């Protein structure tokens, strides 16, 4: 566990009197020409898909923010909701339901009625990148939206970063020194009033190769829940004896 010093008394709060913070890019955002072109090509092929920057999902007044890498081509880029429609969402939402950060049943579609509890999900890069690999410039271009997302969550206490890229850009969004908060699965870093929790990304590749197991993933959210305390409004739909490692 590390404690990160900053030059600001509270890096999570917007400065008073500053410009209006914009947490979501335009539907036709052109900040990254490569991503815009890839998005347009997807629109031409699949006109019924979302094919736009994917907005954050969940409660802006939540205490937990989960940050992924970017929308998957046939996941969030198709459905318009983070981590919805691909394997990563299967593991993430099952885990959130288990620990009371989501309620309902995840059915891999945005109209499944699933709600987040005290929690919000966003991505380091809001547009789908070719081969799931955003370029450094694209990560930098999207960082102001991440910063605004963080700054417009007044009750935020915990940030869970899924993967090294999400971790690194979050550290930069908070204006912190990366060397003071190296990424490692299960690591916890303090940044003022915030705690940053690191996890390997819950991708199919990571789980298939054993880099991340469901048990390892659940352990991160178990710690978040323990640190925050119980959420009385959380509703778990998991039945006794039901497998959790699907």
What does each model-found stretch correspond to?
Residues 2-7, 12, 234-237:
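Ala/Thr-enriched low-complexity intrinsically disordered regions
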């Amino acid at each position: 566990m590390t404690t990160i010093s900053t030059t600001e008394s509270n890096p999570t709060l917007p400065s008073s009197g500053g410009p209006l913070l914009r947490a979501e890019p335009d539907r036709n955002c052109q900040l990254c020409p490569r991503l815009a072109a890839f998005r347009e090509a997807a629109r031409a092929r699949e006109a019924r898909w979302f094919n736009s920057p994917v907005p954050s999902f969940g409660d802006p007044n939540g205490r937990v923010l989960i940050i992924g890498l970017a929308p998957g081509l046939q996941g969030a880029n198709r459905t318009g909701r983070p981590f919805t429609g691909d394997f990563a969402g299967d593991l993430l939402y099952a885990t959130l339901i288990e620990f009371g950060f989501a309620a309902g049943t995840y059915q891999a579609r945005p109209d499944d009625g699933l709600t987040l509890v005290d929690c919000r999900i966003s991505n380091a890069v809001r547009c789908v990148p070719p081969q799931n690999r955003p370029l450094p410039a694209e990560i930098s271009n999207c960082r102001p939206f991440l910063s605004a997302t963080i700054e417009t969550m007044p009750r935020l206490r915990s940030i869970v970063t899924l993967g090294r890229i999400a971790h690194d850009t979050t550290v930069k969004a908070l204006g912190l020194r990366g060397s003071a908060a190296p990424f490692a699965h299960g690591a916890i870093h303090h940044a003022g009033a915030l705690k940053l929790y690191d996890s390997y990304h819950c991708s199919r590749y990571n789980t298939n190769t054993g880099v991340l197991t469901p048990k390892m993933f659940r352990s991160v959210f178990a710690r978040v829940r323990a640190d925050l305390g119980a959420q009385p409004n959380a509703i778990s739909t998991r039945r006794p004896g039901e497998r959790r490692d699907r």
